[in-house]
Amino acid sequence: MDAPYVWVAKDDGSDIVRAAAIIGVGIDYNGNITARLGHGEGATVTLANPGKEHGVHPPKDFHRQLIRIIAELSDASGAFLIRPVLDEAHGWQWLTEPL
């Protein structure tokens, strides 16, 4: 299965991008998770904004977790959506759901 069948959404679901379009993922000092897209004029999408979620920061390797999940799902059959969620008991997590 190719990465075009894997999609990544913002935490509020307002934007969804193809995982194959992502060329980089980062986390800044505020805990914002951003994805840099390979087309356009250096477009970025903020996937998680912990400031609006009462300042709960994601784990320091949260952006690496996304890369790992995309790699795993790229070999799976079917189409998937990955999105960050803030769980009160467990903090920030990546939720994966079939499409």
Summary of predicted features, one role per range:
Residues 1-16, 20-99:
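Eukaryotic intrinsically disordered, low-complexity regulatory linkers and tails enriched in Ser/Thr/Pro
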